[in-house]
Amino acid sequence: MKTTHRALLITATQLLAIEAGAEPATTFSPSPGWALDKAPAVPAPAAPGSKNPADPAAYEEVKMEFGIAPGPFEPTWDSINQHYPGTPEWFNQAKFGVFVHWGPQASGRSGDWYARKLYREGEAPAENHRRNFGHPSEFGYKDVLNAWKAPKWDAAALTQSFHDAGMRFMMVVGVHHDNYDLWDSTYNPWNSVNVGPKKDMIGEWSKEAKKRDMRFCITFHHEYSWWWWADAYRADQHGPKAGVPYDGHLTLADGVGKWWEGLDPRLLYNINLGEYTDGTGKSVTEIAFGQKGIFQDHQDYAKWYAERWALRIMDAIDKYDPDMFYTDGNSPEPFSATLSGSGFKCDAGRRVVAHFYNRSLAKHGKVDTLALIKFQAGNPSVGMTYEVNVPNQIMTDQPWIGENPIGDWYYGPNYTYNAVNLVRSLIEYISRGGNYACAVPIDPEGGMDPECVAMLKDMGAWMKVNGDAVYGSKAWHKWGEGNVVMPNGPLSQHQVDTPYTAADIRFTEKDGKVYAWLMAWPEDGMVTIRSLATAAGDVTSVRLLGDEGSRKFQQTAEGLTLTLVKQPCQYAWCLEVSGKNLKPAP
């Protein structure tokens, strides 16, 4: 038997009903923010791929009007840069963190972007979905959300595992491109408290991180969810279901008598924007990859969506008081009418940053927080990230985090779990002046593979030996020497097989000491560091971390040379070099 209820988004008093055997519906007082009554009318969709986006240069930037916390930070980069006091000290101290890139998309066991790819006929995630759940005209992503319960999820145990691995900050996905909020969202009924596990996941992660003095960041990836879902409005082109629409076309009225009665699919899938193309036949869903433009016939809806985008971020900020927040995308800032910001041009991103900093000042008496805009390069008042790639130079003009996933951004089979990839990534990033966050795979049930658990323990053992040279360190005057760099991309066996040699060395510094990181152990035990030749200044002592006592060394015009005997750890090794004002030898 299936239980249902009827709930108007404005006046409902009961939670959506769920399949038989699950928890009974719970009474609640829904937020007015859930309603679509203020959304502008949307024109009927034109033929797929029939329109080119308009030139952004012909459109003025829209100044948004939603309220933000009062304070000195105004929503302009000039004001934000003027008042921002600088990168918090804790950011540099933390150095190594985890990216909890997890949510219902793990249900597909198909890696990243499963929610969209399940609607792409013929692709592996779509085939997996049909085999495991059914056809997306009958069982679409909304139904995946309902089925996702994460019964093994234990935020306390997982957070402890990350902390034991040496991770000192935690980045957690609040909402991905799938448009599903993983908190008790005021502005979106498609959230983890209403649909699926019925838990405030961001609330739990935040609580456990703060118990362990881990800095907490919520990440938001929904800027382009309003056009990312265009595939959900399609239909199969072949086979027995050819022409049968997927579930993106459903409306609130279609839910009567179903488990999702009272939930409007438009608040999940948004609207059909498949009419826009990039001029080469690519659909709107490909615009983020090298394209730009304004969706000229949907500007009213775009403004409405951009406001909700911002209000959702501010809702989570106000509820969970994070140390950082992060917006995803590959454009210079959200809603910039280019790349992932295509479609609309407004100042919503700056308003959210100003709100965050003003709120921090009012609540804590100082701005000890950091906003991250993924590709906002060169702006000292916000951080940025490097996704699956390592910069080729030291970057100190703004705070930044290097980020990469083990295998892929969401759970999948046959990932390579080897702590050497975490160690090498950490060293490559911190030697260039950044922090490092690794996305550790969590399965649909909320647990980790045994091999992943073992990897984290191995990482923790390595950090016990070398952590003092990691936390609070900064880039030296030179990031390294040698010719080999770890390949870009998600972490796999490819990175494990990186052919480092004893000539590949990285550098950091802390408290007047230079740390030389050996990316490979010398087969004959002899190490020569050319950057620490006599022209670098006088070296007074050298110590191998994890090995008691100083090492005998020789400093010549050719380099600093010493012989090592016993490995105190695995993966990479650190020499602590003392001297006065050491600078790289030319």
Language-model regions: role of each:
Residues 23-586:
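Mature catalytic domains of secreted/periplasmic carbohydrate-active enzymes
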Residues 1-6:
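Positively charged n-region of N-terminal signal peptides that target proteins for export
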Residues 7-19:
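Bacterial N-terminal signal peptides
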